[in-house]
């Protein structure tokens, strides 16, 4: 049990931080949050856990309400607090779901969180491999590369207000 508690704490901190790291494009973290919440809600509903399913539907509704004001111009934004809070809600909903429904595979839940976890893992590995501090930001996240590609290839650097939300939609 102590090893499981330590793993849960490590995984929770990692996933919550991952949602903050993908908050580099306007609306991306919100969109990923909505996608993950819908997926978890469906899994919870199929497993018979209607409380978690309904809670996650409410999270989706709140995020969609936020996105109305955030996308495409970014009148308001999540910031660290919002990204951490949403990641926290999702990861603990997943933990509750795994503990309440034995038929729910932890690997299925991990697949739901694939995008933020993979992007964070690749960022840490890339920084370590290049000899850079792993806790320092860089501009090599997949969403940043996609936005720069759209800017350079289609819009030009002076059209970031178009490339930023479009990159979110593409991803």
Stretches found by the model and what they are:
Residues 16-17, 26-29:
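PRPP/pyrophosphate-binding module of the type I phosphoribosyltransferase fold
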Residues 4, 13, 144:
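Short, contiguous clusters of charged residues that form electrostatic/catalytic patches at enzyme active sites
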Residues 11-20:
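Single transmembrane alpha-helix segments in multi-pass membrane proteins
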Residues 30-171:
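Alpha-helical transmembrane segments
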Residues 1-9:
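Membrane-helix boundary/helix-loop-helix interface segments in multi-pass membrane proteins
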């Amino acid at each position: 049990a102590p090893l499981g508690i330590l793993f849960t704490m490590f995984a929770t901190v990692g996933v919550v931080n991952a949602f903050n790291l993908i908050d580099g494009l306007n609306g991306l973290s919100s969109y990923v949050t909505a996608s993950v919440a819908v997926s978890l809600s469906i899994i919870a509903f199929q497993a018979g856990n209607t409380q978690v399913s309904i809670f996650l539907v409410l999270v989706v509704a709140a995020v969609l309400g936020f996105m109305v004001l955030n996308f495409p111009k970014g009148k308001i934004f999540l910031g660290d607090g919002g990204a951490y809070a949403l990641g926290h809600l999702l990861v603990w909903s997943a933990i509750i779901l795994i503990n309440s429904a034995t038929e729910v595979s932890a690997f299925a839940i991990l697949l739901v969180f694939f995008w933020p976890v993979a992007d964070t893992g690749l960022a840490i590995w890339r920084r370590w491999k290049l000899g850079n501090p792993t806790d320092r930001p860089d501009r090599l996240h997949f969403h940043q590369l996609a936005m720069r590609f759209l800017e350079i290839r289609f819009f030009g650097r002076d059209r970031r207000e178009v490339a930023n939300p479009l990159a979110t939609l593409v991803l």
